[in-house]
Amino acid sequence: MTVFCELDSGGELPEYTTPGAAGADLRANIEEPIALLPGQRALIPTGIKAEIPEGYELQVRPRSGLALKHGITVLNSPGTIDSDYRGEIRVILINFGDSTFIIEPKMRIAQVVLSPVVQATFVVKQESLAETARGSGGFGHTGAS
């Protein structure tokens, strides 16, 4: 499926690094390195604007290597880029690591996955919701061990 893009100066198209990759890497479109202190977050430009086909979204996800080795992740993971958004794709990175992390120009900072979207119709139900074995137990209360 084709996703048409516009690139700002220095921007690069998302790129799949292997034939079986689900996510295409996004690069930091910055001129100077950015120091991300432990606990700090930053909005990183990619220099990419996308025309996402209707009925799809781009999900912005962390790169596993950055998360494992440095504690760097996408704060609102997965971030959603809606099909009607035409602004620059930017990535909210946060440093959960113990040391300062340097984001270098052109560094691969996140990945995007093209995903289908199904919109629900939300309706107020006049009678009680159907009962389940789980009931209202949430946040670690599935009953599974």
UniProtKB/Swiss-Prot annotation:
Cofactor field: Mg(2+)
| Listed GO biological process terms | dUMP biosynthetic process; dUTP catabolic process
Q: Which reaction does it catalyse?
A: dUTP + H2O = dUMP + diphosphate + H(+)
Alphabetic keyword roster: Hydrolase, Magnesium, Metal-binding, Nucleotide metabolism
Which InterPro entries does the UniProt entry name for this protein?
dUTPase, dUTPase-like, dUTPase-like_sf, dUTPase_trimeric
Listed EC numbers: 3.6.1.23
Q: Which residues form the signal peptide?
A: none
Pathway, per record = Pyrimidine metabolism; dUMP biosynthesis; dUMP from dCTP (dUTP route): step 2/2
Q: List the disulfide bonds.
A: none
The organism's place on the tree of life at top rank: Bacteria
Kindly list the positions annotated as binding substrate.
R63, S64, G65, N76, T80, I81, D82
Keyword Metal-binding tagged: yes
Q: Under the GO molecular function aspect, what terms does this record hold?
A: dUTP diphosphatase activity; magnesium ion binding
Enzyme class label: hydrolase
Per its UniProt record, what HAMAP family does this chain match?
dUTPase_bact
State the function annotated in the UniProt record. Answer: This enzyme is involved in nucleotide metabolism: it produces dUMP, the immediate precursor of thymidine nucleotides and it decreases the intracellular concentration of dUTP so that uracil cannot be incorporated into DNA.
Q: Identify its protein family.
A: Belongs to the dUTPase family.
Name of the protein this chain belongs to: Deoxyuridine 5'-triphosphate nucleotidohydrolase
Gene encoding this polypeptide? dut
